[in-house]
């Protein structure tokens, strides 16, 4: 098996666009910078990632429940959380090209390339577009929250924000969940949803966009146990990616330096994936933060509502600390695609070998679980194959393809990660059996048509 090293990220981006995983948003109008739509295969992969996260983090545990909070929250929420005052990035403009950049990103890229920070700051950084010695404006603070106005007139009273994270919708519902779900620490609240950030320099395909989806969970604990729980969730979340097929050597843990921690954090560790970006190949998949009691304390102070917890057994009242694993759905999407991409060889009908592109996605993530392929468009084969496809579709997402040579159809399915191909051939008319081909090893089993669903159920467990 050959995992191409060269610009695999570019190859995967092209594959994603060509096969309908991802489309540029509004493409017929020229597109929107760094905005993407998810096509038929992309939306299935996204849903499967979400399903696996939800099972692992929420429904697979007895100490976590789910929530779905509003995208537009009261403005006071963002004042209390600190986002109105501190959710800023340093913006600089090149005096050569007049393009704008995040100053910290320019400095980080320099450090990644040279192994040390620029001795003279921005003055040492060349213009990314032209390569000339850089000429930069003074950095200024740029608030990344997207504004909107509610009501018929754009007034200060109507000013609201599209949420830059899903977490705050969880914190403001802490007391509701404690009461209605009868939960007490240690317990968590999970949420998957859209967030919005007015990024200065979006890019790297779907890695950094202004509209994105998060998979976040806030885990509320006694303060004395916070460090232990923090390490637990770092280990748990790292293992989740490995269990779903990402190779360990392509993952690393990155500890935020104390001087770069967010205003709420005592310690943050990022799970990073080796995407292969220019400059620094590593990119954040997920941050796991010890947010201390900052969130519940600030919302209690600003709202006047008591958000502490009373421990009846020990007769003590405390404000819980929060451990937050916060994952980017579309970043996970990108990592799973890149890590699954392989090239190998498969035998052709002429006795030779052809190059084969395969997405070795875990079957639980694969957009299509099986493809039903009649050997030809024969009047007796197609109806039988369509009936089988309809039966299997009751359980899984199934493709039906009767166009072209069978070898070419296998390749089409391999390229999008379909784990199984079910071929209805002329022998099927006599023995009521089909050939089931497995994607990775290309092994084939003859299976009775009445047993195909059971055969797949064993091999698609957890899908």
Curated annotation (Swiss-Prot):
EC primary class: ligase
InterPro entries in UniProt: aa-tRNA-synt_IIb (IPR002314), aa-tRNA-synth_II (IPR006195), aa-tRNA-synth_II/BPL/LPL (IPR045864), Anticodon-bd (IPR004154), Anticodon-bd_dom_sf (IPR036621), Gly-tRNA_synthase/POLG2 (IPR027031), Gly_tRNA_ligase_bac (IPR022961), GlyRS-like_core (IPR033731)
Subcellular location: Cytoplasm
CDD domains for the chain: GlyRS-like_core, GlyRS_anticodon
PROSITE patterns membership: AA_TRNA_LIGASE_II
Pfam families attached to this UniProt entry: HGTP_anticodon, tRNA-synt_2b
GO cellular component: cytoplasm; cytosol; extracellular exosome; extracellular vesicle; microvesicle; plasma membrane
Positions bound to ATP: 197-199, 207-212, 284-285, 328-331
Gene Ontology molecular function terms on file: ATP binding; bis(5'-nucleosyl)-tetraphosphatase (asymmetrical) activity; glycine-tRNA ligase activity; protein dimerization activity
Catalytic activities: tRNA(Gly) + glycine + ATP = glycyl-tRNA(Gly) + AMP + diphosphate
Residues the record lists as N6-acetyllysine modifications: 394
Keyword ATP-binding: yes
Its biological purpose: Catalyzes the attachment of glycine to tRNA(Gly).
HAMAP family: Gly_tRNA_synth_B
UniProt record similarity statement: Belongs to the class-II aminoacyl-tRNA synthetase family.
Oligomeric and partner information: Homodimer.
Annotated protein name in UniProt: Glycine--tRNA ligase
